[in-house]
Amino acid sequence: GDWSSDVCSSDLNVGDHGTTIKLYLKDNTDDENYDEYLDQYHLQSLVKKYSDYVHYPIVMDMTVSKKKEDSDEYEDVVENKTLNSMVPLWKRNKREITDEEYNDFYKDKFNDFNDPLKVIHSRVEGTVSYDALLFIPSKAPMNYYSNDYEKGLQLYSKGVFIMDKASELVPEHFRFVKGLVDSEDLSLNISREMLQHDRQLKVIADKIEKKIQSELENMLKNDRDKYLEFFDNFGLQLKFGIYNSYGMLKEKLQDLLLYYSSKEEKYITLAEYVEKMPENQKEIYFASGETLDKIAKI
């Protein structure tokens, strides 16, 4: 059949490539101040929080105060500023990252004054691929053994921030670990409710637990002084992990525990104690108490 159209042709001014999206804010209410989304520093902080590591530059005209040339007066100047970092630290080759870069990132990201005791940077590819950048703090936070402390890792999907404390990513006995996970395989729309049932997240969590366990075992074996520092801060957490699981985690965690030897006057593992037992000794001798001083008086 015949085809006809009533549309009249007209000139079209084609500008630069791209799409213009205009957002209109609601009027302020007693409960919400929508004007804050017009504040350049608030917008900058939102971009840093949620989109700091997307692959493309997010640029905004920002008004800054600058000193006039040959004058003590200041003037407002509009500058084109890229707000996001684009390349996240955890996506870079770890051989090219300095200890200082890791330390600065940790202190800035997790509000700690101290350098981390241990950095665990891994990239895993397989059925579920992800990057993980984990830190063991050098000191237990002030609120660590209180109900106020929240465990969990920051969660990113394709460099976009999803949530701050994904508790499902780290087991209770390793709750001291801070850090983040970024996976290309997770949905950007994943919610806290969905986390508990997400199969891919369960795979990531299992691999992270094994990685932390392996790193602690290596530290115990190859850097005893550093491990002693770790155990002084978080050894109680490992003991509680065994106790709280009614012994189910005993096989997994027992080799990470240290005990003070009155004979050797230092901390040793159970395996080290057994190895040095005389052949005719059939029992393990121990005393328990709140402090070494109190035990010594028994």
Residue ranges with predicted function:
Residues G1-I298:
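Conserved GHKL (Bergerat-fold) ATPase module
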